[in-house]
Curated annotation (Swiss-Prot):
Organism domain of life: Eukaryota
Protein name from the UniProt record: Myosin-10
Subcellular location: Cell projection, Lamellipodium
Record's compositionally biased regions (Polar residues): 1967-1976
Length: 1976
């Protein structure tokens, strides 16, 4: 930007004075102090200078007050040089960090510069004051300027978008985002102001009737929207409480032709309540302040304090008057074209909203019902809205609600009534706002001019992160996620498009996908559903609440990476989403209500039926709202009728918003977006104050830092070649030579001279691109260079000035000497008399000469005057002639221009006619193909009809057969039911016996159940721990110990059993049975233990095999890696051989050219010899004979040589192709060969062979080199010995023969190579076969391993089941001993110990949480360091580059300056020290990694011990005898655990110290640690999900089983009545068939009548076409005339072209002859005659050319005559058009007749039954096709008439088209009549057959299903009854099972039944109704 001093007032807020910034003193101060940024609580960041470094901390001195402080290195951020102060684009900053960005924005803001570029977008900070930078002068300053030509401004963004739209013809968008009060609305208005000024449609136009009306309306739309949609908040006095997208349409020329506004998320709740110190929408205050008395009385207005909805009364806005704003709003409405009635109706609705708030309800005494004690307010409200007061009161207090199929009056409570009134007020205002926007769009819509492009301006709130966020914040943040994704994608796309334009190598990166997980979390419809989908789903569920919604959300999305449970606000927030801008806690209160937005549909219906048309229009979509019955149905009924009737009739708020957002994003994606980020500087609304922390938060939320980061990942600094050369050529003084050089080449030379790293720059087509910081480095080098040059220049200037002063003094000294000498001489001569005489006489000598000189001058003056007059006359004559020639030239040019234009028009007409003809021919072909297709379809339908008739007959036969089978099945069903009843009776007897037995054991079972439940819980814990540990040995030892304990307890129980035998005989029998069962279980347990041991042994063998296999696999991988290296070397050698092969072929080609050169030299020598033969006559004949012989031999040898070379080249090409194929195969096999071990040997052999080949080829190349050198020697000898031609020719022949031999030899070599390549291919195939075999073997091993693992898991499950049975028996026997009472004390003691342990565990978990918080702190530090990671890497590269540059300079100047050696040594020492520090940090990082691993291992050990402790607790709970011992062990383990925790604490403290010290190295380790942690969490999560899934599946299976049982009951009840229904259905079918036949006959009759009417219409159409044909005949005559004229024109053009070709041919011959004359100097005398002849021929041709030109003029005259004839023909065509109009009238009459036909068909459709609707609709479709064809014909006719106006040759094609269409239309109508009849008959028959078939199939399937169910139930019950009888006889365990489902089982084992009487009866009924599967 140009430097400016003394800036004017507006420019002071736009431009920066760079002269102040480029201050050398400031630069030197910055360099000396090592300034950096350090964190500050007050200022965000403060400037400080580094004084001392102490390890990880740095001593700094604050620049502001000089205080010193210790700061961690990680908290320091680099500072940019002073020359980057107040930079206009922050992407240019070399050190890009939060501190630098904040400092730059702060400096510019304090200087009044509120606009700053940040990469590709613009950042705006609200100044909170008016700046003079928005005037028309500023607009004109930015108009037509590019972005970089002017300082940052919203006008620059608007201008860029406007110019891009005009140039690229692509729609544009400007996206303004930011917090409330940041200035989004104001910047939106400035954009509209700029576009309205720049693209005003009335500027430069002739129409001044309504100057700029559209632009005025566009500007006045904002005040209206602000009045109804803006409000005063704490942050902003004019806050937009809605988002809007303003779409401004432009025409092709860039003028505004219309606009459209779309709004989003109006905060309608503000209309009913406001926060403290806030206002509702402006219109309420404006209306109450500005309305006159008459208007107030009409609207029933009162004071501010009389309205409940104005929560805070009247709150004025500083600097604004609501009364004046009301007048401005009314004036804006008038400008927008609002009528007085519309304005009054709107204000009535506004007043009614206030009246809603004044309605008060009262709770009645004895009930909760609400009542309205005072209805005055209701009367006012109903008066304003046009409703009945009584109906309104009834609808509010006792609305009608649909329950089932009936409507009931439901009384409302006071809370429900208040809620309904507020909801109505909000809905009314929202609908008013929507109508207002629609009305403004209607006013801004213009249909006169078509808009081709548009610019959209988006004004929407940015990310909102409060302490607790609701549904509105979710919608806003969801929108911003989508916009940020669009920003990332678009920004980097633009950057990369420039790279592609400039031809830079670049890998495409899409940053838009980074935000996709969070977007999916919100909007995903299913699998799993997102937040909005779950909210919609929950809205439909009965008895759903916000709590159930949150539970579902956690269940579905709990594992999502962007979803978390709140940590800090656990009690307040429900869930947390990680947005782009940060973590946001959401509170889901009233989300269901907000999403449904329910209304009192009774009142809504009254509003819809209002007497006020405006109110009725607002509520016209009343059928799409959620009513009270909907909400009632959710809370009281389970999917009631209200749910069914209302579903699908409306969409929820979330769904509507998602759709509108999707539409908006689709619009924005199709545009070129321009981003404007608005920032609020403070919340006090004070000008000149900037809160650093607030701005930093907004920068993060707006993505400013992220955007710059994305921009800097590429090459953010770029400069055009010319500017780079001009600015930095000073650094490379001798790199560019003098003279002209292309800019790109010059820059490449400069870059090479600067010795830059190639990774730091890219050279494009017009610019050179640099990484961040490179230009800053070049600037520093340039400053140093300029400083040296200036110093040198000053020295030169001082020397020059000193020398010049010295020379001047010397000159003065010599002049003084001359003056002194002259003065001394004058003093001597002044008294001499002759001197006096001399001084007096000398002047007189010139007097006589002066007169002579004057006379000579006078004569000379007269001559000059005469010449001047003569020249002036000649000049006038020349000017007159020149003017005359110019006039003639202009006339000729105009004539020539007119003729060329006429010719071009004629040519264009011919091209258009040819294109039209082609189009008509294509249409004709399409029509013909359609006719053929219709015929084929008719034939297909005919065939289908025959097939369907045959199918109907088959179905009738099947129906008869199935009827007989059904009767048989009915008989079998009756017998089966009798058997089932008998079985049920037997089962009831058995159940009675079981119930008696169960009653006796009921008391005992209750206590058993309690203990078993406790043991089951402990067992579940043990099982989970066992799964985690996977230690089979520990589990086996536990089993052995438990078995021993069980044996002891069994012995004790036997003793107790003997005692109990004397007490109760019944119990003795039961205990004996239990004892027998225990013995059996013991035997089974021993067997299972043996099986478990075998399984464990097999598992050990399998693990051993697996380890061996893994070892073999690792060895194979190592071998494959070696093989890969050998293969790469082999590939390199092969490439080298290929290169040598190419070199060899090139040498052969060179040899061939050399041989041809030798032949050329021999030909030249032969010519010399012929010249000598002319001089020596005697030798002429002999030499001619010899030359002939030699020529024949040479020709023969050439042919042989050429053929040999061609064959050789073909063989080489074949070898290359074959080799290329082999290379492809080889590359395909490379990936597979990695797994094969034998490839090493094969490829080594191949390598040896290829090495051998390479050596062979090297030898061949050397031989060829030798032969080439020999050829060179022979060629030299041939040139020296010209007299020995014969010998030289012999040598050439021998050389050719040798070349042929070489070619043959090379062909043999190629064949050898080919065979070797074939061998290689065979070897590769063999290797692939071996690889496949090995892979199949590996798969077999894996399958065997999987099968063994499955067996092991099954055995483990069996073992666990045995453990459960053993534990159950143990608990039961313990209860029988009655020792439970004695053990209760110990159990309580154990529970207390357990509670203590749980407390200890909780304390440990708290400590772990503290450690987690410490880790979070470290993660924050890591995030801060991550932001500077890119800059650090860049700086590291920069430092390495500096070191390399210094090394190079050391080598250059080592011999010249001794001081440079010291400097280079110092730099080398610094480099070594830096490298040592880096190595030391790397070692620290490794030690840290080891320490972390040790900590993780200690943590795992702690977890294992914790789990062991829980296992010990379980053992304590299960074993009652060793209580004290276990407690002691628990205490010991507790102490050990606490000791380990203490050790872990110390270790973690050491780790924290080391982590704080080596934060840079820790970054890599934390990434790995996070990955491991995420993997562990994912594993746990998947395990939990699997458990939950199993649980859900079990519940689902239970529900399915219950549903199946219920269905079976229903089917059994309906089975008896099915036969009667089938018979009735058959009778109905027969009756329907008869009725259908009758209706079919009636339709056939009606169709015949229609066909007769169609024939009459066709006759009328033919008459109309006959009249049209007469018109076409007349037009054909005119076409013939045109054709003849066209033929003449074409003939003349051909003649002209032939003459032109002849002229060019003659000129070509002349040029060739001239060349021959010039070349043939020896035959000059013989060619002179030929030259004269040719000159005569040329003269003749020139005469002919002149004749052709005269003919051309005649042709032009004739062409003009033809144009006149064309004009006359056009007049004739005008007459023809009137005749064509008559034919159009006839066509319209036919269309009317067709419409009448359609009406008749509709009447027929109403008469025929519903089953024939499809047939009638098909007929309508056919008639519609005819109408479309007629309309198409009309369109083509109209297009043809338009083309006739322009050209004379279109009549023929149009008439031919009309004739073809007439003929085709006749054919189509005939075919359609036939097709209609066929289609009608076929469809009728098809429908009848399909209905009959479906009915028959349904009945057959139903009967078959019932039969199958009955047979299955019968057989299953019979089997179960038999098994039950057998088991009862044996006295063994009885199990009733539903084998059909396999999921519910009831085990009865002796005395261990666990069912009550009720349960037994229900189970019995379930068993009776369960059917086992029947195998068919």
């Amino acid at each position: 930007m140009a430097q400016r001093t003394g800036l004017e007032d507006p420019e002071r807020y736009l431009f920066v004075d760079r002269a102040v910034i480029y201050n050398p003193a400031t630069q030197a101060d910055w360099t000396a102090k090592k300034l950096v940024w350090i964190p500050s609580e007050r200022h965000g960041f403060e400037a400080a200078s580094i004084k001392e470094e102490r390890g990880d901390e740095v001593m700094v001195e604050l620049a502001e007050n000089g205080k010193k402080a210790m700061v961690n290195k990680d908290d320091i951020q680099k500072m940019n040089p002073p020359k980057f102060s107040k930079v206009e684009d922050m992407a240019e900053l070399t050190c890009l960090n939060e501190a630098s960005v904040l400092h730059n924005l702060k400096d510019r803001y304090y200087s009044g510069l509120i606009y700053t570029y940040s990469g590709l977008f613009c950042v705006v900070i609200n100044p909170y004051k008016n700046l003079p930078i928005y005037s028309e002068n500023i607009i004109e300053m930015y108009r037509g300027k590019k972005r970089h030509e002017k300082p940052p401004h919203i006008y620059a963004i608007s201008e860029s978008a406007y110019r891009c739209m005009l140039q690229d013809r692509k729609d544009q968008s400007i996206l303004c985002t930011g917090e409330s009060g940041a200035g989004k609305t104001e910047n939106t208005k400035k954009v509209i102001q700029y576009l309205a000024h720049v693209a005003s449609s009335h500027k430069g136009r002739k129409d001044h009737n309504i100057p700029g009306e559209l632009e005025r309306q566009l500007l006045q739309a904002n005040p209206i929207l602000e009045s109804f949609g803006n409000a005063k908040t704490v942050k902003n006095d004019n806050s937009s409480r809605f988002g809007k997208f303003i779409r401004i349409n432009f025409d092709v020329t860039g003028y505004i032709v219309g606009a459209n506004i779309e709004t989003y998320l109006l905060e309608k709740s503000r209309a009913v309540r406001q926060a403290k110190d806030e206002r509702t929408f402006h219109i309420f205050y404006q209306l109450l302040s500005g309305a006159g008395e008459h208007l107030k009385s009409d609207l029933l207005l009162e004071g501010f304090n009389n309205y409940r909805f104005l929560s805070n009364g009247y709150i004025p806005i500083p600097g604004q008057q609501d009364k004046d704003n009301f007048q401005e709003t009314m004036e804006a409405m008038h400008i927008m074209g609002f009528s007085h009635e519309e304005i009054l109706s709107m204000l009535k609705v506004v007043s009614s909203v206030l009246q809603f708030g004044n309605i008060s309800f009262k709770k009645e005494r004895n009930t909760d019902q609400a009542s309205m004690p005072e209805n005055t307010v209701a009367q006012k409200l109903c008066h304003l809205l046009g409703m009945n007061v009584m109906e309104f009161t009834r609808a509010i207090l006792t609305p009608r609600i649909k329950v089932g199929r009936d409507y009931v009056q439901k009384a409302q409570t006071k809370e429900q009534a208040d809620f309904a009134v507020e909801a109505l007020a909000k809905a009314t205002y929202e609908r008013l706002f929507r109508w207002l926007v629609h009305r403004i769009n209607k006013a801004l819509d213009r249909t006169k001019r078509q808009g081709t492009s548009f610019i959209g301006i988006l004004d929407i709130a940015g990310f909102e992160i409060f302490e607790l966020n609701s549904f509105e914040q979710l919608c806003i943040n969801y929108t911003n996620e989508k916009l940020q994704q669009l920003f990332n994608h678009t920004m980097f796309i633009l950057e990369q498009e420039e790279y592609q334009r400039e031809g830079i190598e670049w890998n495409f990166i899409d940053f838009g996908l980074d935000l996709q997980p969070c977007i999916d979390l919100i909007e995903r419809p299913a699998n799993p559903p997102g937040v909005l989908a779950l909210l919609d789903e929950e809205c439909w569920f009965p008895k759903a609440t916000d709590k159930t919604f949150v539970e579902k959300l956690v269940q579905e999305q709990g594992s999502h990476s962007k979803f978390q449970k709140p940590r800090q606000l656990k009690d307040k927030a429900d869930f947390c989403i990680i947005h782009y801008a940060g973590k946001v806690d959401y509170k889901a209160d009233e989300w269901l209500m907000k999403n449904m937005d329910p209304l009192n549909d009774n009142v809504a219906t009254l509003l819809h039926q209002s007497s006020d048309r405006f109110v009725a229009e607002l509520w016209k979509d009343v059928d799409r709202i959620v009513g009270l019955d909907q909400v009632t149905g959710m809370t009281e009924t389970a999917f009631g009728s209200a749910y069914k009737t209302k579903k699908g009739m409306f969409r929820n708020v979330g769904q509507l918003y998602k759709e509108s957002l999707t539409k908006l994003m689709a619009t924005l994606r199709n545009t070129n977006p321009n981003f404007v980020r608005c920032i609020i500087p403070n919340h006090e609304k004070r000008a000149g104050k900037l809160d650093p922390h607030l701005v930093l938060d907004q920068l993060r939320c707006n993505g400013v830092l992220e955007g710059i980061r994305i921009c800097r990942q590429g090459f953010p600094n770029r400069i055009v070649f010319q500017e780079f050369r001009q600015r930095y050529e000073i650094l490379t003084p001798n790199a560019i030579p003098k003279g002209f050089m292309d800019g790109k080449q010059a820059c490449e030379r400069m870059i090479r001279a600067l010795e830059l790293d190639p990774n730091l720059y890219r050279i494009g087509q017009s610019k050179i691109f640099f990484r961040a910081g490179v230009l800053a480095h070049l600037e520093e080098e340039r400053d140093l260079k300029i400083t040296d040059i200036i110093i040198f220049f000053q020295a030169v200037c001082r020397g020059y000035l000193a020398r010049k002063a010295f020379a001047k003094k010397q000159q003065q000294l010599s002049a003084l000497k001359v003056l002194q000498r002259n003065c001394a001489a004058y003093l001597k001569l002044r008294h001499w008399q002759w001197w006096r005489v001399f001084t007096k006489v000398k002047p007189l000598l010139q007097v006589t000469r002066q007169e002579e000189e004057l006379q000579a001058k006078d004569e000379e003056l007269l001559k000059v005057k005469e010449k001047q007059t003569k020249v002036e006359g000649e000049l006038e004559e020349m000017e007159r002639k020149h003017q005359q020639l110019l006039e003639e030239k202009n006339i000729l040019a105009e004539q020539l221009q007119a003729e060329t234009e006429l010719f071009a028009e004629a040519e264009e007409m011919r091209a258009r006619l040819a294109a039209k003809k082609q189009e008509l021919e294509e249409i004709l072909h399409d029509l013909e193909s359609r006719v053929e297709g219709e015929e084929e379809r008719n034939q297909i339908l005919q065939n289908e009809k025959k097939k369907m008739q045959a199918h109907i007959q088959d179905l009738e036969e099947q129906l008869d057969e199935e009827e007989g089978a059904r009767q048989k099945l009915q008989l079998e069903k009756v017998t089966a039911e009798a058997k089932i009843k008998k079985m049920e009776e037997e089962v009831l007897l058995l159940e009675d016996q079981n119930s008696k037995f169960i009653k006796e054991k009921k008391l005992m079972e209750d206590r058993i159940a309690e203990c078993s439940s406790q043991l089951a819980e402990e067992e579940e814990k043990a099982k989970n721990l066992a799964k985690i540990r996977n230690k089979q040995e520990v589990m086996i030892s536990d089993l052995e110990e438990r078995l021993k304990k069980e044996e002891k307890t069994r012995q004790e129980l036997e003793k107790a059993k003997r005692k109990l035998d004397g007490e109760t005989t019944d119990l003795q029998d039961q205990i004996a049975e239990l004892q027998a069962q225990v013995d059996e279980l013991k035997v089974q347990l021993t067997k299972k233990e043996e099986e478990l041991q075998g399984a464990l042994a097999r598992g050990d063998d399998e693990t051993l095999h697996k380890n061996n296999a893994l070892k073999v696999a690792r060895e194979l991988q190592a071998q494959i890696a070696e093989l890969q290296e050998d293969f790469e070397s082999e590939k390199a050698s092969r490439n080298k051989a290929e290169k040598q092969k190419r070199d060899l072929s090139e040498e052969l080609e060179a040899l061939k050219t050399e041989l041809e050169d030798t032949l050329d030299t021999t030909a030249a020598q032969q010519e010399l010899r012929t010249k000598r033969e002319q001089e020596v006559a005697e030798l002429k004949k002999a030499l001619e004979d010899e030359t002939k012989n030699h020529e024949a031999q040479i020709q023969d040898m050439r042919q042989r040589h050429a053929t040999a070379l061609e064959e050789l080249s073909e063989q080489l090409e074949q070898a290359k192709r074959f080799k290329a194929n082999l290379e492809k195969n080889k590359q395909g096999l490379e990936t597979d060969n990695k797994e094969l071990a034998c490839e090493v040997k094969v490829l080594q052999q191949v390598k040896a062979e290829s090495e051998h080949k390479r050596k062979k080829l090297d030898a061949q190349v050397q031989e060829l080199h030798a032969k080439v050198s020999e050829g060179d020697r022979l060629r030299v000898e041939l040139a020296e010995k010209a007299n020995k031609l014969q010998n030289e020719l012999d040598n050439v022949s021998t050389l050719l023969e040798e070349a042929e031999k070489k070619g043959m030899k090379f062909a043999k070599d190629a064949a050898g190579l080919e065979s070797q390549l074939q061998d290689t291919q065979e070897l590769l195939q063999e290797e692939t076969r071996q690889k496949l075999n090995l892979s199949s073997r590996i798969r077999q091993l894996e399958e065997e391993k999987n099968s063994l693992q499955e067996q092991q898991e099954e055995e483990e499950e069996a073992r666990k089941n045995l453990e459960k049975q053993v534990l159950a028996l143990q608990s039961q026997l313990a209860d029988t001993k009655k020792k439970v009472d004695d053990d209760l004390g110990t159990i309580e003691g154990l529970e207390e110990a357990k509670k203590k342990l749980l407390k200890d565990v909780e304390a440990l978990s708290q400590r772990l949480e503290e450690k987690v918080l410490a880790y979070d702190k470290l993660e924050k530090t890591k995030n801060r360091l991550q932001q500077e990671l890119d800059d650090l890497t860049v700086d590291l590269d920069h430092q390495r580059q500096i070191v390399s540059n210094l090394e190079k300079k050391q080598k250059k100047f080592d011999q010249l300056l001794a001081e440079e050696k010291g400097i280079s040594a110092r730099y080398a020492e610094e480099r070594d020290r830096a490298e040592a520090e880096a190595r030391e940090k790397e070692t620290k990082a490794l030690s840290l990694a080891r320490a972390l691993e040790e900590a993780l291992e200690a943590k795992e050990e702690f977890e294992r011990q914790n789990k062991q402790l829980r296992a010990d607790m379980e053992d304590l709970m299960s074993s009652k005898d060793d209580v004290g011992k276990n407690v002691h062990e628990l205490e010991k383990s507790k102490r050990a655990l606490e000791q380990q925790v203490e050790e872990m604490r110390t270790q973690l403290e050491e780790l924290e110290d080391e982590l704080q010290a080596t934060e840079d190295a820790k970054l890599r380790l934390e990434v790995n640690m996070q990955a491991m942690k995420a993997q562990f969490e994912r594993d746990l999560q998947t395990r939990d999900e699997q458990n939950e899934e199993k649980k859900r599946l079990l519940l689902k299976q239970v529900r399915e089983l219950e549903a199946e049982l219920e269905d079976e009951r229903k089917q059994r009840a309906l089975a008896v009545a099915s036969k009667k229904k089938m018979e009735i259905d058959l009778k109905d079918l027969e009756a329907q068939i008869e009725a259908a036949n009758k209706a079919r006959d009636e339709v056939i009759k009606q169709l015949r009548k229609l066909q007769a009417q169609m024939k009459d219409y066709q006759r009328e159409l033919e008459e109309a076409r006959a009249s049209r044909d007469e018109i076409f005949a007349q037009s054909k005559e005119s076409e013939k005339k045109l054709k003849s004229l066209e033929a003449e024109i074409l003939q003349l053009q051909e003649e002209l072209a032939s003459s032109e070709r002849a002229r060019r041919h003659a000129e070509q011959e002349r040029d060739e002859l001239a060349d021959e004359i010039a070349n043939s100097a020896s035959g000059k005398s013989a060619l002179l005659d030929e030259k004269r002849r040719l000159e005569a021929r040329i003269a003749q041709l020139e005469e002919e050319l002149e004749e052709e030109q005269s003919n051309m003029e005649l042709l032009n005259d004739r062409f003009r005559k033809t144009t006149l004839q064309v004009d006359t023909l056009n007049t004739e065509l005008a007459a023809e058009r009137s005749a064509a109009q008559k034919s159009d009238n006839a066509r319209q009459q036919l269309e009317r007749q067709n419409k009448e036909l359609k009406a008749k068909l509709q009447e027929l459709e109403g008469a025929v039954k519903s089953k024939f609707k499809a047939t009638i609709s098909a007929l309508e479709a056919k008639i519609g096709q005819l109408e479309e064809q007629l309309e198409q014909e009309a369109k083509e006719r109209a297009a043809a008439n338009k083309l006739v106006r322009r050209t004379e040759k279109k009549l023929k094609e149009i008439f031919m088209q009309v004739e073809d269409e007439r003929r085709h239309a006749d054919q189509y109508k005939e075919q359609m009549e036939k097709a209609n009849a066929r289609m009608k008959q076929l469809k009728r028959q098809l429908e009848e057959a399909e209905e009959e078939a479906t009915r028959a199939n349904a009945s057959r399937r139903k009967l078959q299903r019932e039969l199958d169910d009955a047979t299955e139930a019968n057989e299953g019950l019979s089997r179960e009854v038999s098994t039950l009888k057998n088991r009862l006889r044996r006295g063994g365990p009885i199990s009733f099972s539903s084998s059909r489902s396999g999921r519910r089982q009831l085990h009865i084992e002796g005395a261990s039944l666990e069912l009550s009487d009720d349960d037994t009866e229900s189970k019995t009924s379930d068993v009776n109704e369960t059917q086992p599967p029947q195998s068919e």
